[in-house]
C-alpha cells in the first residue's frame, strides 16, 4: 500500500512536458472562464436566440443581393442582370421586412430562449418580449410608427429588454404574485390569467421609463456602447480572436463555440449594418464593417485545415492519405473536426505551431486586404457550412477577389505547414523503420 502511494506521488511529481503545460494553461485560464461565461443563462439565451434568427438574416441578405444585381451603380455602372431592373424594388421590400426588423425578431427569439431555461410558458414569453421591445422604442404615434430602431441598430436594446422583462416575469412567478385559477381550468386560460399582473407591472414600468421620463434606452445604448462595439471591428481584436480560437482548438476545445457568445451579436449587427448601408447607396468597398462570419470562414480554415490536407494528400504515409480522403469532403464545408481530431492536430508537437501560425497570418492578410478596399466588403450572411470559395464570391457581391483571398489563405497554410509536415513525415517513417527492425529481430530470435 505504501509503495502504491509513493508510486502515485512520484508520478504526480513528474515534470510535465511543454505541451501539457500549454494545455493546462489554456484549459484553466482560458477555456474554463469562457465556458462559465457561455453557460450563464442570459448569455446562452442570447446566443441561442441569435442563432434562431439566422435563417431570416440569410434569406434577407440573399434577397438584397438579388435586388442589387438589378440596380445600376452597385457593382458596375449598369445592372449586372438588366432583366431584374423592373422587379428590384420588390426584392427590396422583402429585404426590408426581414433585415430591417432584425431587432424585433431577436427580441422574440431571445425572450423565448431565456424563458425556456426557467420553464416559463413560451407564448407568454414571446408576447412579453415583443411588447417590451415596442414599449422602449415607440414614444410618438402622431406621424405614424417609426421603425428605425427595429433594424440592427436596436439589437442590443432588444437583448436587454427581453432579458430584463423575462427576469421580472420570473420574479412574479416565483413569488406567486399572480392571479390563481382553480383546478380544472384549461392550461391556456390559466397561463393567460397568470400573466395579467406581471404583464401590467412590467408594461407600466417600461412605459414610465420611455414615455413619462422620456428616456430612450436604445439611443442611450448606441451612444454609450456604439463606439466600443464599432472599435471592436479592428485588426487588433480580430487577430487575437483568431489566435485564441485556434489555441483552444489545438488543445481539444471547440474554439468557435467557446468564443462565439462574445462576438456573435456584434457580427450579426455588423453584417446587417453593411446590408443597410449598401441598400442606401454606399459603395460596396466602403461599407462600414469588415469583420463578419463569412470573413472568418474564408480566412481561418483554408489556411489552418486545408493547408495540412494538401500535404496529407501528397504524403508517402498511407495512413495520412487515408485520413485525407476521410477528412477532405467535410473540410470543404469547413467541418474541420475530422482533420483536427483525426490526424490529430490536437496536442501534436509537430502541428500546433503551424496550425495557429497559418490561421493567424491568414487573418492578418485577409483583414488588411479588406481594410485597403481591395475586396468588396461582405453584406450577405450565408449558412456556416457554405464552402469558402462560394461564400467568398457570393457574400462580396460576386467579387472574384473574394475567391482569390481563399486561394491565398490556402497557399499560406501550405507554405507554413511544409517544414513541419516534412519533420512529422520523417519521424513517422523512422517509427515504421524501427518497428520493422524490431519485427525482423523478433522473427530471428524465434527461429
Language model: regions and residue ranges:
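Membrane-interface helix-loop-helix junctions at boundaries between adjacent transmembrane segments
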Residues: 122, 135-236
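Generic multipass alpha-helical transmembrane bundles of integral membrane proteins
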Residues: 200-318, 324-327
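Alpha-helical membrane segments and immediately flanking helix-loop junctions
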Residues: 38-41, 103-114, 127, 131, ...
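Alpha-helical transmembrane segments in multi-pass membrane proteins
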Residues: 59, 103, 107, 111, ...
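Early transmembrane hairpin of solute transport permeases
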Residues: 35-176, 346
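Inter-helical loop and helix-membrane interface segments of multi-pass membrane transporters/permeases
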Residues: 67-94, 120, 131-153, 182-184, ...
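Cytosolic juxtamembrane amphipathic/interface segments immediately preceding
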Residues: 27-50, 87-88, 181-190, 338-340
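Transmembrane alpha-helical segments and their short flanking loops
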Residues: 12-37, 76, 81, 85, ...
Amino acid at each position: 500500500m505504501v509503495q502504491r502511494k509513493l508510486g502515485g506521488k512520484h508520478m504526480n511529481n513528474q515534470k510535465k512536458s511543454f505541451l501539457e503545460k500549454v494545455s493546462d494553461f489554456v484549459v484553466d485560464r482560458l477555456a474554463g472562464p469562457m465556458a462559465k461565461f457561455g453557460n450563464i443563462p442570459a448569455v446562452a439565451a442570447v446566443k441561442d436566440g441569435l442563432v434562431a434568427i439566422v435563417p431570416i438574416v440569410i434569406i434577407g441578405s440573399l434577397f438584397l443581393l438579388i435586388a442589387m444585381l438589378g440596380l445600376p451603380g452597385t457593382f458596375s455602372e449598369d445592372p449586372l442582370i438588366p432583366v431584374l431592373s423592373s422587379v428590384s424594388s420588390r426584392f427590396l421590400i422583402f429585404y426590408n421586412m426581414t433585415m430591417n426588423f432584425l431587432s424585433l425578431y431577436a427580441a422574440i427569439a431571445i425572450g423565448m430562449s431565456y424563458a425556456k431555461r426557467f420553464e416559463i410558458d413560451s407564448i407568454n414569453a414571446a408576447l412579453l418580449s415583443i411588447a417590451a421591445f415596442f414599449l422602449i422604442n415607440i414614444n410618438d404615434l402622431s406621424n405614424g410608427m417609426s421603425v428605425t430602431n427595429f433594424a440592427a441598430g436596436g439589437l442590443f436594446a432588444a437583448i436587454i429588454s427581453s432579458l430584463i422583462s423575462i427576469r421580472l416575469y420570473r420574479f412574479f412567478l416565483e413569488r406567486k404574485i399572480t392571479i390563481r385559477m382553480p383546478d380544472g381550468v384549461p392550461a391556456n386560460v390559466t397561463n393567460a390569467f397568470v400573466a395579467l399582473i406581471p404583464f401590467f407591472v412590467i408594461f407600466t414600468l417600461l412605459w414610465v421609463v420611455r414615455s413619462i421620463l422620456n428616456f430612450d434606452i436604445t439611443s442611450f445604448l448606441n451612444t454609450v456602447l456604439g463606439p466600443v462595439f464599432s472599435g471592436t471591428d479592428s485588426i487588433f481584436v480580430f487577430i487575437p480572436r483568431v489566435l485564441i480560437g485556434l489555441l483552444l482548438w489545438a488543445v481539444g476545445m471547440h474554439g468557435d463555440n467557446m468564443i462565439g457568445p462574445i462576438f456573435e451579436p456584434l457580427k450579426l449587427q455588423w453584417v446587417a449594418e453593411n446590408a443597410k448601408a449598401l441598400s442606401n447607396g454606399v459603395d460596396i468597398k466602403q461599407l462600414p464593417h469588415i469583420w463578419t462570419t463569412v470573413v472568418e470562414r474564408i480566412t481561418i480554415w483554408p489556411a489552418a485545415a486545408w493547408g495540412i490536407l494538401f500535404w496529407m494528400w501528397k504524403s508517402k504515409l498511407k495512413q495520412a492519405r487515408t485520413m485525407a480522403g476521410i477528412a477532405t469532403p467535410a473540410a470543404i464545408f469547413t467541418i474541420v473536426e475530422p482533420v483536427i481530431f483525426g490526424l490529430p492536430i490536437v496536442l501534436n508537437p509537430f502541428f500546433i505551431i503551424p496550425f495557429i501560425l497559418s490561421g493567424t497570418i491568414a487573418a492578418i492578410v485577409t483583414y488588411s486586404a479588406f481594410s485597403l478596399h481591395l475586396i468588396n466588403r461582405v453584406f450577405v450572411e450565408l449558412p456556416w457550412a457554405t464552402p469558402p470559395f462560394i461564400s467568398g464570391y457570393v457574400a462580396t457581391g460576386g467579387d472574384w477577389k473574394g475567391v482569390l483571398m481563399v486561394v491565398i489563405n490556402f497557399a499560406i497554410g501550405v507554405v507554413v505547414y511544409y517544414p513541419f509536415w516534412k519533420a512529422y513525415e520523417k519521424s513517422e517513417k523512422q517509427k515504421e523503420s524501427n518497428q520493422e527492425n524490431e519485427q525482423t529481430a523478433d522473427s530471428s530470435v524465434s527461429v
